[in-house]
Design a protein with these regions (language model features):
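Short, mixed-charge aromatic SLiMs
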Residues: 1, 22, 40, 136-145
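FKBP-type peptidyl-prolyl cis-trans isomerase
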Residues: 1-9, 29
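Soluble non-cytosolic domains of exported or imported proteins
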Residues: 8-12, 16-24, 68, 79-82, ...
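C-terminal cap of thioredoxin/glutaredoxin-like
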Residues: 10, 20, 147-214
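Short N-terminal helix-initiation segments at or just after the protein's N-terminus
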Residues: 11-14, 43-50, 128-136
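Extracytoplasmic thiol/disulfide redox context detector
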Residues: 18-109, 164, 168-180, 186
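Structural alpha/beta surface segment adjacent to cysteine/selenocysteine redox centers
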Residues: 71-150, 155, 160, 182
């Protein structure tokens, strides 16, 4: 018996057709199950009490009287956090009159940048340090931090004392541990009205979520 050669692409075309057919059948089955079970699809899950973080040291700006909160658990030394800060800045510019925006430190351990922001907060300069560090093109080292503190005309003796305060370190370390206990695992983590946002960090999707909450 002689073998009959198949034309090139015949098997690939058949497999492709079978895959498309399988996908259609599966999608039809899923749609049918959704309709019968009346399942609702969420972009993020219903409220989870364990993800409430407002009792921790959260810094706020925007509309402080708003019932809609947008909290970010973030790390100054995290590349993804630095990138997300650009999106967050756009959201803040768009919704600052309607939303209460919050920030809470979250990392493996308290960083120099985080400690500096908390020390600056003692003199009312948390957000200026926060923005400057995220906008800095390199890792914020002690030289950058002290030079920026001087440029803001802080009391340098007081700033230095608070920067190296054991209580300052313990406070941030405790916050990090509490966040881990509440289920946070990565940075940046977004929390809108006590709900974790798992799926997206895009400006468009986050805008839609905020519009739904307002």
């Amino acid at each position: 018996n002689s073998l009959i050669p198949l034309k090139k692409g015949t098997i690939e075309e058949e497999l492709s057709f079978q895959q498309r057919l399988r996908n259609r059948i599966v999608q039809a089955l899923v749609d049918s199950l959704y309709q019968k079970a009346d399942i609702k699809r969420y972009i993020y899950p219903p409220k989870q009490p364990e993800c409430v973080v407002r009792d921790l040291c959260v810094h706020y700006r925007g509309n402080l009287d708003s019932s809609t909160s947008f909290i970010v658990a973030s790390d100054y030394n995290c590349g993804r956090c630095v990138q997300f800060e650009k999106t967050l800045s756009k959201l803040y510019d768009q919704y600052r009159e309607q939303v209460k925006f919050g920030f809470v430190h979250f990392a493996d351990a308290p960083s120099l940048a985080a400690l500096a922001c908390e020390a600056a907060d003692k003199q009312g300069q948390f957000w200026s340090f926060h923005d400057a560090i995220f906008n800095y093109v390199e890792v914020a080292d002690s030289a950058f931090i002290y030079n920026f503190a001087k440029s803001k005309r802080l009391d340098m003796r007081e700033f230095d004392k608070n920067l190296h305060s054991p209580d300052n370190y313990k406070k941030l370390d405790n916050i990090i541990n509490r966040l881990v206990e509440r289920g946070l695992m990565a940075t940046p983590t977004i929390i809108i009205n006590d709900r974790l946002v798992y799926v997206t960090n895009s400006y468009e999707e986050l805008s839609k979520l905020l519009e739904r909450e307002l």
